UniProtKB/Swiss-Prot annotation:
One of its GO terms (cellular component) is cytoplasm. It comes from the Bacteria. InterPro entries: G_OBG (IPR031167), GTP-bd (IPR006073), GTP-bd_Obg/CgtA (IPR014100), GTP1-OBG_CS (IPR006074), GTP1_OBG_dom (IPR006169), GTP1_OBG_dom_sf (IPR036726), OBG_GTPase (IPR045086), P-loop_NTPase (IPR027417). This is GTPase Obg. CDD domains: Obg. The keyword GTP-binding applies. It comes from Thermodesulfovibrio yellowstonii (strain ATCC 51303 / DSM 11347 / YP87).
């Protein structure tokens, strides 16, 4: 299934039904008064969160959503039937924005949470509504009001406790496949992960938590380079970030610079991301034979007071210690421990 996390749609609420112009015409009521009924209200367009959905794929192909209009009023004071509301289901974690101003209209971060994105028009009054002592036979009724319409942006931000970030091929996919039941594509080339992957982690007697594997970031990601900022939004909701840095002998870059590049991209995208609790994970220690890169990164983290965990996901070295740390941190953050 394709992962779509950003779409633009048009919504139109139902118009109100028009009021009716009618008069009583009964055999023994020669001067029957007005009896035109009111028009029905137009249906609202409602966007509602559902845990059954995990992507905005459906809305990529259907861009226009219109609610039912209200029916017109009838004689004998019969009110027109209200139009049915149109409910648009989206994944939990979807943010609704005005397409023109980009103002956040709603953050649907809970199951069944909803937002009325376009309100239906009021039905028009029938002529019975306008009868007065001086005008007992009004030949006027109101038209229904127009329903609201607008373009909106639906933006999905995944709900995860821990976000795995790092340069391409840092070992994020391997780690999440070891600590959870998630099975992302794994290979020894950059950008293997093209979409965010979620995995549920259960460690000993701790509460389970959700980890998100975010596609690899590169310099300029905040401007859209590489897979770009389209996936940076998914780390905004996390409680804790894990910076994964390749410390193997096969990587030629300075591990300290690798870490700082990602920190810079986070700050340029959203400075609040650098304020989140985080730890650094040195990956692939099973092929860090010389230990130079591992030593540099470990010393750097010690000097900066950063929690550091050297691991080998392939050989499961250091994994237990890392999971214990994550379980305690996420548990405390969620108030579970």
């Amino acid at each position: 299934m394709q992962f779509i996390d950003y779409v633009k749609i048009y919504v139109k609420a139902g118009d109100g039904g028009r009021g009716c112009i009618s008069f009583r015409r009964e055999k023994y009521v020669p001067k029957g008064g007005p009896d035109g009924g009111d028009g029905g209200k137009g249906g609202d367009v409602i966007i509602q969160a559902s845990s059954e959905l995990h992507t905005l794929l459906d809305h990529r192909y259907q861009k226009v959503y219109k609610a039912q209009r209200g029916q017109h009023g009838k004689g004998s004071n019969m009110k027109g039937k209200d139009g049915e509301n149109l409910i648009i289901k989206v994944p939990v974690g979807t943010v609704v924005k005005d397409a023109e101003t980009e103002e956040v209209l709603a953050d649907l971060d809970e199951e069944e949470k909803y937002f009325i994105v376009a309100k239906g028009g009021r039905g028009g009054f029938g002529n019975a509504h306008f009868a007065t002592p001086t005008n007992q036979a009004p030949r006027y009724a109101q038209p229904g009001e127009k329903g609201q319409e607008r373009w909106v942006i639906l933006e999905l931000k995944l709900l995860a406790d821990v976000g795995l970030i790092g340069l391409p091929n840092a070992g994020k996919s391997t780690l999440i496949s070891v600590i959870s039941s998630a099975k992302p594509k794994i290979a020894d080339y950059p950008f293997t992960t093209l979409i965010p992957v979620l995995g549920v982690v259960k460690y000993e007697n701790y509460q389970s938590f959700v980890v998100a594997d975010i596609p690899g970031l590169i310099e300029g990601a905040h401007k859209g380079a590489g897979l770009g900022h389209q996936f940076l939004r998914h780390v905004e909701r996390t409680s804790l970030l894990l910076h994964l840095v390749d410390v193997s002998d096969f990587s030629e870059s300075d591990p300290r610079e690798d870490f700082e590049k990602i920190q810079k991209e986070l700050e340029l995208y959203n400075p609040a991301l650098t304020k989140k609790p985080f730890a650094v994970v040195g990956t692939k220690i099973d092929i860090a034979y010389k230990g130079d890169r591992l030593g540099k990164l470990k010393k750097y983290c010690e000097e900066k007071g950063i929690d550091f965990f050297p691991i080998s996901a392939v050989k499961k070295e250091g994994i237990d210690k890392l999971l214990h740390y994550l379980s305690e941190k996420v548990g405390k953050k969620c108030g579970l421990l």
